[in-house]
């Protein structure tokens, strides 16, 4: 079996359906004896350019190891699902399991916010003691 990186973009009005879509697509892969190495839901993000007069889309990234039949079925599902506005399936040489730069940047921002909040609490505590 080969390794693939799959990214698909969902219409922003259909964001509520994304968990069900992810479940359906992962079931397709695991049902064909494939494995999912990484699954990231990037959420709703700004597009670089409008697609079908849309400026935002909901992004999902999958890194999988699956047979060609499962990938063909996924591509067919993407093509006939009107909620999926773009998809890309790319073959990669190795399984990728570490977090993508998108998730790493998000985690770093969260850590900075937490550090800032803690620093703000320390300053507030110092003011109340005087």
UniProtKB/Swiss-Prot annotation:
This is Small ribosomal subunit protein bS6. The keyword ATP-binding does not apply. Belongs to the bacterial ribosomal protein bS6 family. Residues 104-116 have a biased composition (Basic and acidic residues). Keywords: Ribonucleoprotein, Ribosomal protein, RNA-binding, rRNA-binding. Binds together with bS18 to 16S ribosomal RNA. InterPro entries: Ribosomal_bS6, Ribosomal_bS6_CS, Ribosomal_bS6_sf, Ribosomal_S6_plastid/chlpt, Transl_elong_EF1B/ribsomal_bS6. It comes from the Bacteria. GO terms for cellular component: cytosolic small ribosomal subunit. Residues 100-130 are annotated as: Disordered. Residues 117-130 have a biased composition (Acidic residues). GO terms for biological process: translation. It comes from Pectobacterium carotovorum subsp. carotovorum (strain PC1). It holds the Pfam family Ribosomal_S6. GO terms for molecular function: small ribosomal subunit rRNA binding; structural constituent of ribosome.
